[in-house]
């Protein structure tokens, strides 16, 4: 999350394996209408440009973290501040699977649009 919070696109993209996938959120959404995820460097870069970089700031507060082998699950809340200052939060579970070379093979986000709340 450091790279996201710092708006460091190249550092964030470098975290992913060449065949990595981002599913944020899991299933069909405004970010991924077909629900297939953003797979590979170009698709992950487009996700960053269209979703991450489009926001003023993104802060993830981890409440609990579970590590098992090459996988990790973080439970917490993500707060997104939009250009202009309005903000929203949503609780979720974010899972990560590491590839053999230590990069992120899969980032999967479990959150529901119905649970998004406006904050000030």
Language-model features: locations:
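Short, aromatic-enriched amphipathic alpha-helices that serve as compact interaction elements
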Residues: 1-8, 15
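A solvent-exposed, acidic/Ser-Thr-rich amphipathic alpha-helical stretch
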Residues: 10, 17-69
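A beta-strand edge to alpha-helix "cap/lid" segment located at domain peripheries
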Residues: 45, 49-120
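Short basic coil micro-motifs at the edges of alpha-helical modules that engage polyanionic partners
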Residues: 1, 35-36, 87
